[in-house]
């Protein structure tokens, strides 16, 4: 029978000093036999996805204590990728994932907490906490702050919605010289109306959806908007549930509730199956690979490639379409609705466990609105956006008049009526990416699935932006942005500005972009990232020259630099001859801090999740 970890610091005469300090935090005599549960919050006023979380830690804590536990809250950092985008701040985004994972480990192990509730939301916070949960392997429940409502422009005549908006629309309009200042400002003011994670199937929402599929979050975690009153129930339930999980593990020796027991290889494959089916952000590939490594699960790019070849695209939301946002996915039945369709297509392992319903199959039976779910589920998925700008959680209780149960032409489709039988994400291989690269096929126009173009080479994101806005990129070009990988950046910047500017220049369907960096979940078009190995690690992307021909073939999962092997060997030899300057950008002016240098020293390429290679450290 496992012992409560917290007894290390709460029991025995030699722990008198620790108990004295615990008492100074408010603990009473009767609390020392209870489980101590960490409430891992990520509130910050810097990030709209987290600005409303200040009081939610206390809400969870009150439920923990009502259920017989002791709650102790702490905060992690949280970087807003949108605000950090397009300047040196983006260098810090991906490395912050490792800091979050480490800081959670530090706090939980230093204070011998027995379990956790992780209150996350945005891009690197959910993955960082997920990595920590796998590392610590103590009972955990994830509950996110929830998605932002989509922005809306209404008719001045009848008030009806004439367009839905998000952050990406604001960026594209602002960069389009044909758009007036007045129109650009209207979109800017309307694009992000409420608290919550950005309203499309971007990285934050993708990851919060995937925690449902892995089995560590409650139904609706990824889709019910942050402002809705019914989301409060997820936080209350999380507080009660984590105490139950604690007792099952520590008092009943039930290890099935532990993260590593739930997040098995089959669970990671289920999550990736969902990811491909819903056209999730390409960043999710990095984060699932990283979390799997922390869990000790052998889940690799080859598994992702295998899954992507057999799973159809069953759901589309912005940026893959301007018709649907996450709030519309919720109305169609949320993640359990998509999982239900995948289950009926025999594409899931329904025996995988979770924190709330026994098995995935049981969860689908209870929550899939097209699979016979009861009245509670039918009501829950009617939760709608309120349409009132606010930074306050649970501030409205609007409901949809009807559910979207149309599996032929609706937001969520069945396999027979899939958006495409090819999934929403694909892994490409070739001499430009021997270890693979990722494309979000759900966001690529089918006319571009096979594409050949001329290389326009840039050694940094900043140079690429300047080149695109300066009309140095033309229809038929393949924009190459290199030395932006985990080690070469360092930090593997997102390329939302270059992809948005290609659209604003009218090149969204006539150009491609290939990089060893990564993309915001808001990027769409023929944009291919995560080239592995990256340029700084000797990847072939570092040998591409201006005007080279690049061949892209999504159906055959191929990307190829049309240069002979002899020429490539000569280029590689010339690069190696540069000595210490080999595999580094030429004439790039970028200040790299000591903190980023420390990350770069251990960073791996994207095919390993851009995690740190700790095997380099000597014991």
Curated annotation (Swiss-Prot):
<dbReference type="Pfam" id="PF24877">
    <property type="entry name" value="ILV_EDD_C"/>
</dbReference>
<keyword id="KW-0408">Iron</keyword>
<comment type="pathway">
    <text>Amino-acid biosynthesis; L-valine biosynthesis; L-valine from pyruvate: step 3/4.</text>
</comment>
<keyword id="KW-0001">2Fe-2S</keyword>
<feature type="binding site" description="via carbamate group">
    <location>
        <position position="124"/>
    </location>
    <ligand>
        <name>Mg(2+)</name>
    </ligand>
</feature>
<dbReference type="InterPro" id="IPR037237">
    <property type="entry name" value="IlvD/EDD_N"/>
</dbReference>
<dbReference type="InterPro" id="IPR042096">
    <property type="entry name" value="Dihydro-acid_dehy_C"/>
</dbReference>
<feature type="binding site">
    <location>
        <position position="122"/>
    </location>
    <ligand>
        <name>[2Fe-2S] cluster</name>
    </ligand>
</feature>
<feature type="binding site">
    <location>
        <position position="123"/>
    </location>
    <ligand>
        <name>Mg(2+)</name>
    </ligand>
</feature>
<keyword id="KW-0100">Branched-chain amino acid biosynthesis</keyword>
<dbReference type="GO" id="GO:0000287">
    <property type="term" value="F:magnesium ion binding"/>
</dbReference>
<dbReference type="InterPro" id="IPR056740">
    <property type="entry name" value="ILV_EDD_C"/>
</dbReference>
<comment type="function">
    <text>Functions in the biosynthesis of branched-chain amino acids. Catalyzes the dehydration of (2R,3R)-2,3-dihydroxy-3-methylpentanoate (2,3-dihydroxy-3-methylvalerate) into 2-oxo-3-methylpentanoate (2-oxo-3-methylvalerate) and of (2R)-2,3-dihydroxy-3-methylbutanoate (2,3-dihydroxyisovalerate) into 2-oxo-3-methylbutanoate (2-oxoisovalerate), the penultimate precursor to L-isoleucine and L-valine, respectively.</text>
</comment>
<dbReference type="GO" id="GO:0009097">
    <property type="term" value="P:isoleucine biosynthetic process"/>
</dbReference>
<dbReference type="GO" id="GO:0009099">
    <property type="term" value="P:L-valine biosynthetic process"/>
</dbReference>
<dbReference type="Pfam" id="PF00920">
    <property type="entry name" value="ILVD_EDD_N"/>
</dbReference>
<protein>
    <recommendedName>
        <fullName>Dihydroxy-acid dehydratase 1</fullName>
        <ecNumber>4.2.1.9</ecNumber>
    </recommendedName>
</protein>
<dbReference type="GO" id="GO:0005829">
    <property type="term" value="C:cytosol"/>
</dbReference>
<feature type="binding site">
    <location>
        <position position="494"/>
    </location>
    <ligand>
        <name>Mg(2+)</name>
    </ligand>
</feature>
<feature type="binding site">
    <location>
        <position position="198"/>
    </location>
    <ligand>
        <name>[2Fe-2S] cluster</name>
    </ligand>
</feature>
<dbReference type="GO" id="GO:0004160">
    <property type="term" value="F:dihydroxy-acid dehydratase activity"/>
</dbReference>
<feature type="active site" description="Proton acceptor">
    <location>
        <position position="520"/>
    </location>
</feature>
<comment type="subunit">
    <text>Homodimer.</text>
</comment>
<keyword id="KW-0456">Lyase</keyword>
<keyword id="KW-0411">Iron-sulfur</keyword>
<comment type="similarity">
    <text>Belongs to the IlvD/Edd family.</text>
</comment>
<keyword id="KW-0028">Amino-acid biosynthesis</keyword>
<feature type="binding site">
    <location>
        <position position="81"/>
    </location>
    <ligand>
        <name>Mg(2+)</name>
    </ligand>
</feature>
<dbReference type="InterPro" id="IPR000581">
    <property type="entry name" value="ILV_EDD_N"/>
</dbReference>
<dbReference type="InterPro" id="IPR004404">
    <property type="entry name" value="DihydroxyA_deHydtase"/>
</dbReference>
<feature type="modified residue" description="N6-carboxylysine">
    <location>
        <position position="124"/>
    </location>
</feature>
<keyword id="KW-0460">Magnesium</keyword>
<comment type="pathway">
    <text>Amino-acid biosynthesis; L-isoleucine biosynthesis; L-isoleucine from 2-oxobutanoate: step 3/4.</text>
</comment>
<dbReference type="GO" id="GO:0051537">
    <property type="term" value="F:2 iron, 2 sulfur cluster binding"/>
</dbReference>
<keyword id="KW-0479">Metal-binding</keyword>
<dbReference type="InterPro" id="IPR020558">
    <property type="entry name" value="DiOHA_6PGluconate_deHydtase_CS"/>
</dbReference>
């Amino acid at each position: 029978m496992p012992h409560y970890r917290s007894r290390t610091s709460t029991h025995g005469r030699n722990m008198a000093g620790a108990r004295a300090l615990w008492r100074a935090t408010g603990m009473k005599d009767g609390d020392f036999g209870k489980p101590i549960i960490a409430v891992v919050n990520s509130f910050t006023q810097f990030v709209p996805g987290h600005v409303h979380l200040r009081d939610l830690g206390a809400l969870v804590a009150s439920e923990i204590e009502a259920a017989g536990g002791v709650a102790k809250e702490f905060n992690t950092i949280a970087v807003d990728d949108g605000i950090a985008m397009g300047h040196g701040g983006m260098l810090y985004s991906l490395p912050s994932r490792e800091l979050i994972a480490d800081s959670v480990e530090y706090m939980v192990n230093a204070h011998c907490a027995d379990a956790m509730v992780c209150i996350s939301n945005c891009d690197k916070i959910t993955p960082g906490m997920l990595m920590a949960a796998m590392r610590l392997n103590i009972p955990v429940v994830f509950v996110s702050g929830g998605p932002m409502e989509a922005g809306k422009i209404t008719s001045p005549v009848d008030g009806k919605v004439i367009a839905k908006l998000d952050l990406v629309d604001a960026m594209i309009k602002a960069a389009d010289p044909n758009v007036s200042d007045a129109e650009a400002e209207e979109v800017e003011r309307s694009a992000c109306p409420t608290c919550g994670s950005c309203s499309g199937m971007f990285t934050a929402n993708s990851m919060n959806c995937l925690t449902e599929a892995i089995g560590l979050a409650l139904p609706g975690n990824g889709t019910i908007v942050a402002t809705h009153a019914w989301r409060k129930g997820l936080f209350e339930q999380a507080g009660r549930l984590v105490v139950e999980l604690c007792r099952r593990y520590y008092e009943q020796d039930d290890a099935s509730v532990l993260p590593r027991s739930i997040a098995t290889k089959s669970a990671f494959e289920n999550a990736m199956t969902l990811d491909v089916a819903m056209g999730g952000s390409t960043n999710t590939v990095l984060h699932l690979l990283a979390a799997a490594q922390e869990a000790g699960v052998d889940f690799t790019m080859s598994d992702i490639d295998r899954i992507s070849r057999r799973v159809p695209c069953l759901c589309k939301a912005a940026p893959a379409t301007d018709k649907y946002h996450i709030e519309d996915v919720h109305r169609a039945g949320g993640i359990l609705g998509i999982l239900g369709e995948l289950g009926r297509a025999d594409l899931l392992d329904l025996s995988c466990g979770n924190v709330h319903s026994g098995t995935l199959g049981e969860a689908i039976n209870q929550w899939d609105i097209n699979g016979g779910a009861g009245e509670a589920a039918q009501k829950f998925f009617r939760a709608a956006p309120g349409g009132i700008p606010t930074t306050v959680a649970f501030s409205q209780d609007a409901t949809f008049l009807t559910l979207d149960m149309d599996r032929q032409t609706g937001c969520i489709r069945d396999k027979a009526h899939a958006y495409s039988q090819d999934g929403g994400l694909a892994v490409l291989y070739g001499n430009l990416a021997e270890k693979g690269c990722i494309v979000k096929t759900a966001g690529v126009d089918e006319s571009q699935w096979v594409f050949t173009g001329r290389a326009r080479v840039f050694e940094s994101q900043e140079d690429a932006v300047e080149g695109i806005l300066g009309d140095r990129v033309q229809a038929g070009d393949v924009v190459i942005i290199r030395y932006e990988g985990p080690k070469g950046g360092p930090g593997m910047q997102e390329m939302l500005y270059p992809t948005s500017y290609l659209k604003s220049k009218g090149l969204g369907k006539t150009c491609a972009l290939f990089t060893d960096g990564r993309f915001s979940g808001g990027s769409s078009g023929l944009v291919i990232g995560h080239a592995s190995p990256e340029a700084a690690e000797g990847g072939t992307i570092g040998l591409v020259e201006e005007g080279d021909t690049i061949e892209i073939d999504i159906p055959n999962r191929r990307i190829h630099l049309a240069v002979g092997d002899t020429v490539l060997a000569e280029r590689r030899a010339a690069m190696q001859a540069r000595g210490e300057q080999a595999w580094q950008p030429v004439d790039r002016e970028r200040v790299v801090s000591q903190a980023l240098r420390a990350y770069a020293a251990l960073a791996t390429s994207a095919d390993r999740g851009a995690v740190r290679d700790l095997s380099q450290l000597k014991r």
